[in-house]
Amino acid sequence: MFSFRSPPFPRNSHSSPPLKPLLCLSLSLSLSLSLAHTPAHPPLLFPSIVPMDPSSADVVAHDFPPFFKVYKDGRVERYKMFNNDGPSPAGDDPATGVRSKDIVILPDTGVSARIWLPRIDDCRGRKLPVLVHYHGGGFCAGSPFDPIGQRFFTTMVPKANVIAIDVDYRLGPENPLPTAHEDSSEALKWLASHSGGHGPEPWINEHADLNRVFLIGESAGANIAHYVAVRAGSTGLTGLKIVGSIIAHPFFGGKEPDKMIMFMYPGSPGTDEDPLLNPAVDPDLPKMAGERVLVCVAENDWLMPRGVKYYETLRDGPWKGEVELDEAKGEDHCFHMFKRNERAEQLLQRMADFINRE
């Protein structure tokens, strides 16, 4: 197993205490969820799997590879998805001058974040755009403290010259959906509390231009970023201005029920009939905050059709902003988070240009 948390914030580990509430759903989810699940699609974020050591004789009640399985006694165990050296510590990156630190932003729920700041010489005396990031991982994996995030932000922060906030929302299945979405929305309210330079985080007070806020997410995180933009617009959030969103390789629902989503999201059909999984059926879509959206898809990604559909929904629907589509030929799901090839660099530059466009 691998840990999803950095040492200051050990909220979710690879094996958790018994998951009593979700086991109570077994009657409503019935036989189909009681069987080991073989997904009809590849993982939402991670491209490779390191098998678990099958040393336990415990009975598995629900199995959702490559993400997690739930034992009959309610314990949750996560699959080891890739080899890494554990969480990357916050601090100064000597190669880029990018600084980072970890903070708790919602003490009542334990939601934390990692904040990234470009080289001080590049931001002294002026305010920077704010990039709020929601990581991918099927709503049940990933963390701002993983090495993946460090590689991305030490490249993206100086390239776009932004202050970035990577939100550590609570994960399923221990925290059923839409907890991840609600945590992420509350994190944006926390950011808005810095309006006027009087918030709890000095880096934001000193360096953040809250009139230039951008949301970004990949895979499940892209779903969350969209949700946060819609929620901000529909509730009239004050204290900041969302200029745009970057929706990369988004996960949205399809025609067939997604059993893992159904397990983590009680009451959801797990299909495109659910507004949380399909923006086209969300009555609040016209109120989505932001002037522009960049939708990123990859040619070899099984989710590409859903990303294109999202682009078409914004382009042809009642939302009145500007939407762009970027298709990466020959690439797969979330390649820009794992690779540093020419196409990944081009996509990150496209994102930076999108943020800094006047």
Give the ranges of each region predicted by the language model:
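Aromatic (phenylalanine/tyrosine) cluster motif
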Residues: 2-4, 9, 46
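Generic detector of solvent-exposed, compositionally biased contiguous segments
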Residues: 6, 18-19
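Prokaryotic Sec-type signal peptides and long signal-anchor helices
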Residues: 6-8, 13, 239, 358
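Intrinsically disordered, low-complexity terminal segments enriched in Ser/Thr
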Residues: 13-18, 24-46
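Alpha/beta-hydrolase superfamily serine-hydrolase fold, recognizing
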Residues: 50-358
